[in-house]
Amino acid sequence: MGMASSHRLFGQLAPSSVMRACSATGRAVAKADRSSALDGGRSQVAALVSRETLARLDTIAEQLTRWQKTINLVAPNTLPDLWHRHIADSLQLVWLVPETVLNWADLGSGGGFPGLVVAAVLAEREGAHVTLVESDTRKAAFLREASRAAALPTRIVPERIEQASQRLAAGMQVVSARALAPLPKLLDLTEPFLQAGALGVFPKGRDWERELTDARKGWTLDLNLHRSVADPYGRILAITRAERAAPSAGSLSGGQPSTAGAASARPRTAKGKTP
């Protein structure tokens, strides 16, 4: 199945029927042993991607399972649900952006979600590059080895996001981050990318509404909300514009009134001098 046809299939299924299918997969996973659970989730993903992309995803899953024995890449209790909980959850981000996207940055890539999954799909696009930023050297080593094994078009940047973002932002079309930070902090981290014109694609769990409310206290946002196919309570925030809100007069002085003119408000002595 080619990229265009898989995109159409996802569009035909989303959002309600895909959510039902993913929920059913999740319930089956909880009752099955590890091998059958992984196969069940894999079958659901296989309907949405090409054979070549599926082969790359298989390699990613194999590498993660092997490295997970020595490095905590994902929560251990989510490993039996790998294809649904992590791969499908990451895959859905690709369908929310234009098919012309070639340059994608994933921050705090950790166990490779969504970055490695995005790269597995974008590998079918000539000239595509996915930049994975991960400061943990062991996790960066995993990302590098998984990318090599699956022949992914990635660049691994083993640096802190704060150090790398200004240098990497130019030319990026999409920036993503999964389970990295609450939205207000996430906007701070991704600001260079958003200001450079990148689309921010951020999956959020059941607290998405509270995070969005908190973020809007300090930011003016243009965004679209999409239901998650992997989490019935979650949403994916697709942010097209983010600007810091102008501080109020009170906030400029830390919430205290200005000291200008304070002397004139004090009582004066008979000689007109302030005590």
From Swiss-Prot:
Entry keyword set: Cytoplasm, Methyltransferase, rRNA processing, S-adenosyl-L-methionine, Transferase
Positions contributing to S-adenosyl-L-methionine binding: 108, 113, 161-162, 178
Domain of life: Bacteria
Class in the EC hierarchy, top level: transferase
A single MF term (Gene Ontology): rRNA (guanine-N7-)-methyltransferase activity
Record-listed E.C. numbers: 2.1.1.170
Protein name, as recorded: Ribosomal RNA small subunit methyltransferase G
Lineage: Bacteria, Pseudomonadati, Pseudomonadota, Alphaproteobacteria, Hyphomicrobiales
Gene that this polypeptide is encoded by: rsmG
